[in-house]
Regions:
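A short, exposed loop/beta-hairpin motif centered on an aromatic-Gly-Thr core
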Residues: 44-64, 68
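Short arginine-rich
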Residues: 67-82
Length: 86
């Protein structure tokens, strides 16, 4: 069975806010990485409205984007990270 998605819990060190980073396959050649602000138990506050979302075309790009966002959200201010992507 092929992997269908990734899921990471992230605690932002500068702001102490919690986020959930999720990458899922939407179509055969379309992946979506979404960042949700989370509560203390790492449950997203708004399931239908992610705070940030990026679409990629290949699985490798999606996985790289997922791990890149996870690493940056741990160390940098979220607004700064979200501003850098269209």
């Amino acid at each position: 069975m092929a992997a269908k998605g990734l899921f990471n819990k992230v605690k932002n060190l500068p702001t102490r806010r919690r986020f959930v980073v999720s990458t899922i396959r939407k179509d055969e050649n379309r992946f979506e990485t979404a960042v949700f602000e989370a509560n203390f138990f790492y449950l997203p506050r708004r399931w239908s409205k992610p705070d940030f979302m990026v679409e990629t075309r290949t699985r490798d790009e999606a996985w790289d984007m997922h791990f890149h966002l996870t690493a940056r959200l741990t160390q940098e201010y979220p607004a700064q990270v979200f501003k850098e992507y269209p």
